[in-house]
């Protein structure tokens, strides 16, 4: 009897261990996620626009590994609200997060939209993933406790020389006593070595993670700070781009003559260099040279990451997503900044690579960066999160589904929106004034066709896609270095906007 009892007990224990082993194996078999954010990266890279013969071989390499979206658009053309939207899966018009919001203040009890939201990295953590992150991921780094292993972020966008090279950071705001702050914008060769750059140090940290063994699948996030201003990288990256070889983007000095007043107010950026200033001072090509140099530096660091992943045990079972928070204008529409609802400010690179995805595929249909959250969940075999406001792109990548009816929405402040569909862009401002562009015939968006009867039905169709919700500015969200948004928040909220002394001081 006892023998029979112990035999049954042994069988039960063996069965339990087998089930436990199967469960562990099931967890390990889930794909890992390598999540890469690049700050202020526009579509000039070689696998998309290949502007001015830019040298970005590792972006080409990533494109060959998976799917490149050539017409992806940001939730907002500003770091803070764009990243908050991507990490929550919620539109700025839903949350009221239109400006810069401290990472720990995004999810709060007094914001009905975000009070119980699950951030993207958290969703993986809650589903058995080991979460890790370093660099600029949210507006600063990340909310407290976001990662099992966190590398943090070097504050600011340094290192900095003792004295700025060209731009004082105030621009015309000096005449307003600097009341709208000071930008980090400047350009020049600095420091002497890549090893002094925070992005290089962050990649070193990531490479250490690839050398470890994990019992769980991992979610590993890396946030690059360049090519965000200041446009400082070592001289060797500038040497790739002799000034005589630099192209400048198309520009018309009277381009803004048909823009509604709200659009002009939004484009009033007193601290930033204007295109006219850049032309007259001879600095235009130098600014572009510095931007291209910064992008090539990031490309090199990306190559280090791809090499390390390739040589790791995780090479065949890791999903890669690389994205930027918005585009960046290099003289288009009169300035050097993101900060607008036009194509050059909202469009940015988006790549996916990994198991069960085609290689070397390009998709030219407009899509949203907001789709990153649901797309990663589906690729990882995780249950969809009902709070996500955008659609997964998996079927589009795998089967070309949804190419004809896809669109992208960008929001900039309360009730200012752009809608991009294939070949057209519609912009509506809070006062109902409009812009409409036929991108097929007018890729530079120089001719506002909003009053052209020829496009009436198309305009109405795009207008129907605008968000139906336009939340009041979140109390903790501020954008006080731009005159129009200071006025908009103060006008629409009881509490006035809080002062910000320096652009990027909290980044």
UniProtKB/Swiss-Prot annotation:
Post-translational events: The conversion to 3-oxoalanine (also known as C-formylglycine, FGly), of a serine or cysteine residue in prokaryotes and of a cysteine residue in eukaryotes, is critical for catalytic activity. This post-translational modification is severely defective in multiple sulfatase deficiency (MSD).
Major site of localization recorded for this protein: periplasm
A GO cellular component annotation in the UniProt record: periplasmic space
Active site positions: 79, 139
Keyword Cell membrane: no
Signal peptide, first to last residue: 1-18
InterPro entries, alphabetized: Alkaline_phosphatase_core_sf (IPR017850), IDS (IPR035874), Sulfatase_CS (IPR024607), Sulfatase_N (IPR000917)
Compartment(s) where it occurs, according to its Swiss-Prot or TrEMBL record: Periplasm
Keywords: Calcium, Hydrolase, Metal-binding, Periplasm, Signal
Pfam annotation, one family: Sulfatase
Modified residues (3-oxoalanine (Cys)): 79
Amino-acid biosynthesis listed as a keyword: no
Binding site for Ca(2+): 39-40, 79, 325-326
Enzyme class: hydrolase
Cofactor note: Binds 1 Ca(2+) ion per subunit.
GO molecular function per UniProt: iduronate-2-sulfatase activity; metal ion binding
UniProt-listed Enzyme Commission number(s): 3.1.6.-
UniProt cofactor(s): Ca(2+)
Function: Sulfatase that may be involved in ulvan degradation. Ulvan is the main polysaccharide component of the Ulvales (green seaweed) cell wall. It is composed of disaccharide building blocks comprising 3-sulfated rhamnose (Rha3S) linked to D-glucuronic acid (GlcA), L-iduronic acid (IduA), or D-xylose (Xyl). Has no activity on different ulvan polymers.
UniProt family annotation: Belongs to the sulfatase family.
Protein name per its UniProtKB record: Sulfatase
